[in-house]
Regions:
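Bergerat-fold GHKL/Histidine-kinase-like ATPase
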Residues: 1-286
Length: 286
C-alpha cells in the first residue's frame, strides 16, 4: 500500500543517511603523532615544522561496529596483517588501542622518530597514515643551492619532501593493505575510501634528477597548492573501481595533490613522472 511503501522508503533513506554519517566520522586520523600534542616550550623558534601526513581511510561497509567479532576472529586478523608485513620483508610491531590495533614497522615510542602506521578495527576497517620523507639539513641546503642555480627563488625555510623516497614509503605501506585483503579473501568492493592531507599546504617536492631540474626550470616548483583537506568519499562497489588497489590509489592521489602531473598527455610530464619513479640521480653540483 501507499503508506507502507512511503514508510519503507523513509526507513531506507534514514539508514543510508546514518551510514554516510558513520563513514564521514570514521574518515579522520586517530593514530597519535607527536605534533598532535601542543608544545609547551616558550621558545617558538626551536619548534620543528609540522610533519606532512597522508592518511588513507578504508571503511568496511555491510558490518555494524556493534557486531564485535570473537577474540579468535580478531586474532586471525592480526595473523593476516603480520603475514602481509612478512611477505614484504618488513618487521611488524603491534600496539593495542581502545578499539583498534596499530601496526608499525618499528616500536612506537612517544617522541621517537615518526613512522607510518596502520590502524585495524574489529570490523576490518583500516586507516593508513604515512609521513612525508623530509629532507635532512644537509639535503635541504643542497636543494636550495641547486634551485638557486636555476634562478628559482624559494624561501630559506621552505619545506621539502623527497619525491621518490616518499612515493616508495606511501606505496610500500599501501601494498600491505592490498596483501591483507587478499589474505583475508575480502573484496575491495566492500569498502568506502577517502584520503586526507595534513600539514601539506605549500610543501614542495624535491628530486635530484636531471629531468626534475629541467622541468622546474620551465614550469616552477611542484608543491601542494591546496590547504589541508579531506577528499570526497568513494564507494568501491560503484562499478567503476573494480580494479581498485590501495597501492595505486594512495600513490597517485598523494602525488597529484603535490602537483605531480599524473595522467597528463604531455610527453614532458610523463618523462618527469617516470624519472621520479626511478629516482635516477643527477650530476648537478658535483
Amino acid at each position: 500500500s501507499g503508506p507502507a511503501l512511503g514508510s519503507a522508503l523513509v526507513e531506507l533513506y534514514s539508514k543510508a543517511t546514518k551510514r554516510k554519517q558513520e563513514i564521514r566520522e570514521f574518515c579522520q586520523r586517530t593514530v597519535w603523532y607527536p605534533a598532535d600534542t601542543p608544545c609547551t616550550s616558550q621558545d617558538s623558534t626551536t619548534s620543528e615544522a609540522p610533519l606532512p601526513l597522508f592518511s588513507l581511510y578504508l571503511y568496511r561497509m555491510g558490518r555494524r561496529a556493534a557486531d564485535t567479532p570473537s577474540r579468535a576472529a580478531q586474532e586471525s586478523h592480526v595473523v593476516a596483517m603480520r603475514s602481509a608485513f612478512a611477505q614484504q620483508g618488513m618487521s611488524c610491531h603491534v600496539q593495542h588501542a581502545h578499539d583498534s590495533l596499530i601496526f608499525r614497522t618499528s616500536k612506537g615510542i612517544p617522541g621517537s622518530s615518526v613512522h607510518s602506521a596502520i590502524e585495524l578495527f574489529p570490523d576490518e576497517s583500516m586507516k593508513l597514515t604515512v609521513p612525508g620523507v623530509m629532507l635532512d639539513p644537509h639535503m635541504q641546503e643542497e636543494a636550495l643551492r641547486q634551485i638557486s642555480a636555476l634562478d628559482i627563488e624559494v624561501p630559506a625555510n621552505a619545506l621539502f619532501i623527497g619525491a621518490t623516497e616518499t612515493l616508495r614509503r606511501v606505496t610500500r605501506m599501501a601494498s600491505l593493505l592490498d596483501r591483507y585483503v587478499r589474505l583475508r579473501t575480502i573484496s575491495w568492493t566492500n569498502y568506502a575510501v577517502a584520503y586526507e592531507l595534513e600539514n601539506m599546504a605549500g610543501v614542495m617536492l624535491w628530486s635530484e634528477t636531471e629531468t626534475y631540474a629541467r622541468y622546474i626550470s620551465n614550469h616552477g616548483m611542484l608543491f601542494c597548492g591546496t590547504t589541508d583537506c579531506r577528499s570526497r568519499i568513494r564507494y568501491l562497489d560503484d562499478g567503476i573501481h573494480g580494479s581498485f588497489r590501495a597501492r595505486q590509489f594512495a600513490g597517485s592521489h598523494f602525488f597529484e595533490a603535490c602537483g605531480l602531473p599524473l595522467g597528463s598527455p604531455s610527453e614532458e610530464d610523463n618523462e618527469l613522472v617516470d624519472a621520479l619513479l626511478r629516482g635516477e640521480k643527477t650530476n648537478m653540483g658535483q
